Amino acid sequence: MVVIGGAATVMTRHRGQSFAIWGTLGYFTVMEALQVAGYRVLDQCGTSSNQAVTLLSYLHIAFQPLFINAFAMELVPEPVKLRFRLWVFGLCAASSVIMLAQLIPAPAFGSCTPGSPLCGDALCTVSGNWHIAWDIPYNGLLVPVDAAFGTRFGFPSYMITVFVLPLLYGAWRFVLLHLVSGPILAWTLTNNPNEMPAVWCLFSIVIVLAGLSPFFRRSISSGTWWGVRV
């Protein structure tokens, strides 16, 4: 996957594609590299190398909404992208800040809910059912938000910016594809909430396909804003 992602990044940049396309491919290729690194330090909890890989993996996830939305906005009409992009990037940046704040070990915030994605007692990359899993001791800053919606996302700001925000500018085809090939597929392949995000990231190959294939990209693009010509 690292080789495929790297080749896709170089190819799309060579073709003159926008940074939103090849930059997103490159960013998710970094995640594949982090997963390879995770296997080299697997279950070595307490070591600086394992903790570094785990923390970098979390930080990568925290900033994914920026790249996912940059990619998704390439799939909608240019006037729509220009009208929404500042708000979109602002909200994605806010989500990233919130996810960074969830790492603050503040007793006042409490702790994450056991069974929520990535929730763990100590920072460590460990063995999942068949893939790697990440244990992150994040705080309970957003537990009340999850409780209000009756969910256990752990990171509701991420879910909103990745799956709800693109709907506002009309990238519904991409959202549907991402939902099916991401969390839904991941949950069918593992019941481990700490392994699921790593499996989800593993299948970022779908974004690679969308970046490489003009036909595939057209099939998930929208020529209107919810049926309205702009």
Residue ranges and their predicted role:
Residues 6-10, 34-47, 58-90, 99-104:
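Internal transmembrane alpha-helix with an interfacial aromatic "cap," most often the third helix
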Residues 1-4:
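Hydrophobic transmembrane alpha-helical segments in integral membrane proteins
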Residues 45-57, 113-117, 198-203:
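Non-cytosolic membrane-interface motifs at loop->transmembrane helix junctions
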Residues 71-158:
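Membrane-proximal helix-loop-helix units in multi-pass membrane proteins
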Residues 7-15, 71-80, 166-172, 212-217:
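Structural signal for the C-terminal ends of transmembrane alpha-helices
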